[in-house]
Amino acid sequence: NAKVTGLDLSPYFLAVAQYRTRQRHYDINWVHAAAESTGLPDASFDLVSIFLTCHELPQIPTMEIFAEARRLLRKGGYFAIMDMNPNSENFKRMPPYVLTLLKSTEPYLDEYFTLDIEQALVAAGFNPPRIRENSPRHRTIIAQL
């Protein structure tokens, strides 16, 4: 009985999402907005999740998204993040030339890799998060309000 809302800044991605939603007969409310300022009502969600987003952004918008997630969540709600894991052995062992190539396609990777995500979430008002590896290069972060 969950009500699902999806959000994206790209009208093109939203058009694809709406098309696929209709194909599968899902009931999802798609919203065109920036994750930092959704315009959605305060305390209206039990779960907010973002997927492979933080590494695409500078630290300031990332922290703005954390604050927006906190605003959107009801007390006791969860914020789930899945993204690259800067502590991954795969990244640590990556030859410098490969890492340089990766960074050429990921301009904010250094900012993401230096972000203390646990501290940033606590500073945004969340309880200390649980962080788990979910693949050789990715992690899931769960923070409760």
Residue ranges and their predicted role:
Residues Y78-N134:
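C-terminal alpha-helical "lid/dimerization" subdomain adjacent to the S-adenosyl-L-methionine
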Residues M63-K75:
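A short glycine-rich, Lys/Arg-flanked "PGG" loop and its adjoining helix->strand segment in the class I
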Residues N1-S37:
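Class I SAM-dependent methyltransferase SAM/SAH-binding core
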Residues S135-R139:
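Short acidic/glycine-enriched loop/turn segments that link adjacent beta-strands
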Residues I141-L145:
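C-terminal lobe and adjacent flexible extensions of AdoMet/dcAdoMet transferase-like proteins
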Residues D46-I60:
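A short SAM/SAH-binding and catalytic strip from SAM-dependent methyltransferases
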Residues E36-V48:
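A short acidic, Gly/Pro-enriched loop at the edge of an enzyme's catalytic core
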